[in-house]
């Protein structure tokens, strides 16, 4: 009788622990990420996808690229920075130019071409910077009907007498 009572008591405790575990997500292991105060709860395989940093619908998008670590390349090559013209030279600019800059720096001509915004597929895509031969051009019916004829048959084996067969 005492054995069955202790078995019932142990299964009852296991059930209580499971209920507490399922009701409280922080009952599982707590993993402290770093010194910035993020706390990651890792109590099942899917819980990590509901936490900050694992999905794009959190407040991550409200930060600028300068704030987010690792996006310096995207910030550097963004169209807003490329289009921004350099300031006009000052009348006192020659006083602040060093001899090294005067002798060794190459003056790059300022481009008068400004980029016009084109439709893009994803946020990092910048079709304005693609070379012309990579850009897609729409084919009209005239271009498809009156293009160069493509060969319809190919010869698999062509005999060339200049090639010696040994």
Swiss-Prot record:
Physiological role: Microtubule inner protein (MIP) part of the dynein-decorated doublet microtubules (DMTs) in cilia axoneme, which is required for motile cilia beating.
Disulphide bond pairs: none
Ribosomal protein keyword on record: no
GO biological process, one term: flagellated sperm motility
Main subcellular localisation: cytoplasm
Record region (Mn 2): 139-149
Pfam families: CFAP68 (PF06608)
GO cellular component, one term: nucleoplasm
Family to which this protein belongs: Belongs to the CFAP68 family.
Record region (Mn 1): 98-109
Record keywords: Cell projection, Cilium, Cytoplasm, Cytoskeleton, Flagellum, Nucleus
Native organism: Mus musculus (Mouse)
Keyword Cytoplasm: yes
Protein name: Cilia- and flagella-associated protein 68
Subcellular location(s) per record: Cytoplasm, Cytoskeleton, Cilium axoneme; Cytoplasm, Cytoskeleton, Flagellum axoneme; Nucleus; Cell projection, Cilium
Record's subunit section: Microtubule inner protein component of sperm flagellar doublet microtubules.
């Amino acid at each position: 009788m005492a054995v069955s009572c202790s078995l019932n008591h142990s299964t009852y405790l296991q059930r209580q622990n499971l209920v507490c575990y399922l009701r409280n997500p922080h009952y599982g292991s707590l993993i402290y990420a770093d010194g910035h105060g993020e706390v990651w709860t890792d109590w099942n395989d899917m819980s990590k996808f509901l936490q900050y940093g694992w999905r794009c619908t959190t407040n991550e998008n409200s930060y600028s690229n300068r704030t987010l670590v690792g996006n310096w390349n995207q910030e550097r090559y963004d169209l807003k920075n490329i289009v921004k013209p350099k300031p006009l030279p000052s009348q006192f600019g020659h006083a602040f130019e060093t001899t090294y800059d005067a002798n060794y720096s190459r003056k790059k001509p300022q481009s008068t071409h400004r980029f016009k915004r084109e439709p893009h597929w994803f946020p990092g895509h910048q079709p304005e910077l693609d070379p012309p031969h990579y850009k897609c051009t729409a084919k009209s019916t005239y271009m498809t009907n009156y293009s160069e004829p493509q060969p319809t048959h190919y010869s698999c084996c062509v005999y060339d007498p200049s090639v010696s067969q040994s």
